Amino acid sequence: SLGVRKVIFIPDKYLAQNIAKETDIEIITWDNGSCEVHELFTPEDLIEARDSVDNLKIIAHPECPPNVISEADFSGSTAKMIEWVSENKPDKVMMVTECSMSDNISAENPDVEFIRPCNLCPHMKKITLPKILDNLLYLNNEVKIDPVIAKKAFHAVDRMIKLDIS
């Protein structure tokens, strides 16, 4: 527990809604924020997949809409989905998230058949190892924040970093 009754949660409205369902915390969110990949999934997609694939387990990223999460067998962060597959070793699994995630996890779980509903993220595809190296070497995309804004934000950011959620 965070020891608070109300939290401002941005930028993803679906993640905020899913967290609100799991906690007793009032969550204030920004209605325009969502992941374009995760919001493309519908409950009907999951129902259709389950009807057409025997013994299918469905795991969904919590940035999916709540009605999609309610059709899944498990919902968790990317790390939690990886952990779930490794621990449960389902015969067949559909990961309701960006499709390259299944590609990454399938290499470590060759006995699991991955059903891939493929929604590609155009933004994630822009990230490449050469671009990361270039940015680390030359700091090409440095973000500069107005000192007045930085000072106002410092205490909130510092509290988030120090927060013990274990």
Where are these regions (language model features)?
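The feature marks the mature, well-folded catalytic cores of soluble enzymes
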Residues: S1-S166
